[in-house]
């Protein structure tokens, strides 16, 4: 779904690189994704097939301007949260519960199906939008929130 969506965008003309982080999950499926990407897209493709040191991975994520996740279920939440905090424009499938969870907390996230015009522009977030998402991140992920969650979990309060 994502590769077909990307095929219609002007990735090559704008010198974009598609990053495929495939270091976990089914290796045979990852092979199919890589093969399909090379036959479908006409731009640079970078694959991550092995785990790398966390600092190196975070450096790669910090360079991502647009992140597209095509899964229908809640997966890759840690990557999505980090990308939002690092300033990436994130697109999720509209049936992905994480899209709704993030929007409920006022994050600026986009639906892959409903916001296709936004995706087609191939622009990242503005500085104001990045600051907004970082503020949402700080409100959502902090020690006070973690303590409250643990108290509810452990003490059913």
Specify the residue positions occupied by each region the protein language model found.
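A conserved mid-protein helix/loop that constitutes part of the nucleotide-sugar donor-binding site
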Residues: 1-10
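Nucleotide-activated donor-binding/catalytic signature segment of Leloir-type glycosyltransferases, i.e.
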Residues: 32-51
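Conserved active-site histidine-acidic residue motif and adjacent donor-binding/catalytic loop
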Residues: 48-60, 96
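Short alpha-helical segment that forms part of, or immediately flanks, the ligand-binding pocket
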Residues: 58, 78-86, 99
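Acidic donor-binding loop of glycosyltransferase active sites
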Residues: 59-75
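Short hydrophobic beta-strand element within catalytic cores of glycosyltransferases
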Residues: 89-92
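A charged, aromatic-enriched C-terminal amphipathic alpha-helix characteristic of glycosyltransferases
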Residues: 119-157
């Amino acid at each position: 779904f994502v590769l077909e969506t990307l095929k219609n965008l002007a990735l090559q003309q704008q010198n974009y690189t598609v990053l495929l982080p495939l270091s976990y999950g089914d290796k045979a499926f990852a092979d199919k994704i890589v093969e399909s990407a090379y036959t479908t897209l006409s731009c640079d493709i970078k694959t991550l097939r092995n785990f790398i040191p966390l600092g190196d991975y975070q450096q790669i994520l910090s360079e991502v301007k647009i992140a597209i996740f095509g899964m229908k279920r809640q997966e890759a939440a840690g990557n999505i949260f980090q990308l939002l905090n690092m300033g990436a424009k994130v697109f999720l499938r509209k049936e992905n519960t994480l899209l709704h969870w993030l929007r409920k907390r006022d994050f600026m996230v986009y639906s892959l199906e409903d916001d296709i015009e936004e995706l087609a522009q191939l622009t990242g977030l503005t500085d104001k939008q990045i600051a907004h998402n970082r503020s949402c991140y700080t409100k959502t992920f902090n020690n006070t929130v973690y303590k409250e969650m643990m108290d509810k979990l452990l003490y059913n309060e």
